[in-house]
Amino acid sequence: MPRPYEIVAPLTVYEVLRRMRRLHRQDVEHFLHRLVDRPALSGDFEAPADDGRIHQVKIVGGWIVSYWIDHAACEVRVTSLEFIE
């Protein structure tokens, strides 16, 4: 049985999630659950990051979720969660 993927994110991402309105938080959490189930799921576009990796970027409601997949560790690395202004 393959090892399940897990979400890994900096504390700042969890703080943003905690402060979100319930409906927005549910939308983002639903996307993250889908991503854990299907880590090959692509974002809306890709963007280079300072660490040299190409990050997937997904627009969820009014929020931008940036992430990359560490297949070796079975982790979804969420790097940022920002409101679109």
What are the functions of these language-model segments?
Residues 1-33:
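Arg/Lys-rich, positively charged N-terminal/basic patches that mediate binding to nucleic acids
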Residues 36-41:
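Short proline/glycine- and basic residue-enriched helix-capping loop/turn segments at helix->loop/beta transitions
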Residues 44-85:
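Basic/aromatic recognition patch in beta-strand/loop cores that engages polyanionic ligands
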Residues 33-35, 83-84:
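Short, charged/polar low-complexity linear motifs in solvent-exposed/disordered segments
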